[in-house]
């Protein structure tokens, strides 16, 4: 029988271990060849979670660090698909934990990607960290760390795990736009993650590359509960300005969030402060209701 790369890959896709054995024994198939998606038999087996087949392929010379056309390795696939046993086996057999794909994402970041397997991803991330994964590594395009990604996706338990294992919760780590993990959580309105990050030492007054603070992000997105927590527990500067001279009150006023405007005014937000264009919160107000609130408190 004539064998080729597709015979082996199809056998792996079908979990047909007898056929895989037969093909490997023939010595006529390149075990590291790729299919039309540029994935090897080992990558496919790692996704599918068949440890017996993974072992068979590795024992017969499969390269554990070969990359797909976008730079993914078998370990990345196993991590992303929640295959803990295979992750362990590949690492024990020479898989490089800190290798990155073409987007600059490490195996650790790949392990965060399948939100349907959150419990399993926690175990995989902990295993990767225990075996030398760089917890503060960033991807190339956005410059986001695992902590930023988990904070933006609302995965509280992952955020806790990362911080407890040394992830940089302070403002030292920022993405390409200057955002911190706390900014991401505030923007998304995730109060529990915001609380945890603040309690863990996150800088509530950190600013991004345009001078936006955490409070401004929450005000722009309309997250009143987050705003209340930041002001009441975080010693946040209510009147901080961004690079255009806008304050949190201006952002809320412009966006039409009357309850946020009322609360910020109660907390002594400066109602007459002007931005770089000479505009006040009253000038920027989106509705008559907000204008009335501001006028009653002395806005001019």
Enumerate the language-model features and the residues they cover.
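Conserved ankyrin/ankyrin-like repeat signature
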Residues: 19, 52-53, 86, 120, ...
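Leucine-rich solenoid repeat scaffolds
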Residues: 265, 270-300
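Ankyrin-repeat inter-repeat connecting loop/turn
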Residues: 31, 64, 97, 135, ...
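Start-of-repeat signature of ankyrin repeats
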Residues: 4, 38, 71, 104, ...
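Ankyrin repeat boundary/linker residues
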Residues: 35, 68, 101, 139-140, ...
């Amino acid at each position: 029988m004539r064998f080729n790369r597709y015979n082996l890959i199809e056998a792996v896709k079908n979990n047909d271990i007898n056929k895989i054995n037969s093909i490997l024994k023939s010595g006529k198939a390149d075990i590291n060849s790729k299919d039309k998606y540029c994935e090897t038999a080992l990558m496919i087996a790692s996704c599918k979670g068949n440890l017996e087949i993974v072992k068979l392929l590795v024992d017969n010379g499969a390269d554990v660090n070969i990359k797909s056309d976008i730079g993914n390795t078998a370990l990345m696939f196993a991590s992303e698909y929640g295959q803990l046993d295979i992750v362990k086996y590949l690492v024990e057999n020479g898989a490089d934990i800190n290798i990155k794909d073409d987007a600059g994402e490490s195996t650790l970041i790949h392990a965060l990607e399948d939100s349907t397997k959150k419990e399993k991803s926690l175990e995989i991330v902990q295993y990767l960290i225990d075996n030398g994964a760089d917890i503060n590594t960033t991807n190339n395009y956005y410059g986001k760390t695992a902590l930023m990604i988990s904070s933006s996706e609302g995965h509280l338990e992952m955020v806790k795990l990362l911080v407890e294992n040394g992830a940089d919760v302070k403002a030292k780590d920022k993405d390409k736009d200057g955002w911190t993990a706390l900014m991401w959580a505030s923007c998304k309105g995730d109060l529990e993650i915001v609380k945890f990050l603040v309690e863990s030492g996150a800088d509530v007054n950190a600013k991004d590359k345009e001078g936006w603070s955490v409070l401004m992000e929450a005000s722009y997105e309309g997250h009143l509960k987050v705003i209340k927590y930041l002001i009441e527990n975080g010693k946040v500067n209510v009147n901080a300005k961004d690079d255009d001279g806008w304050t949190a009150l201006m952002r809320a006023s412009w966006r039409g969030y009357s309850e946020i405007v009322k609360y910020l005014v109660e907390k002594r937000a400066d109602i007459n402060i002007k931005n770089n264009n000479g505009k006040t919160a009253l000038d920027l107000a989106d509705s008559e209701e907000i204008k009335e609130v501001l006028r009653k408190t002395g806005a001019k």
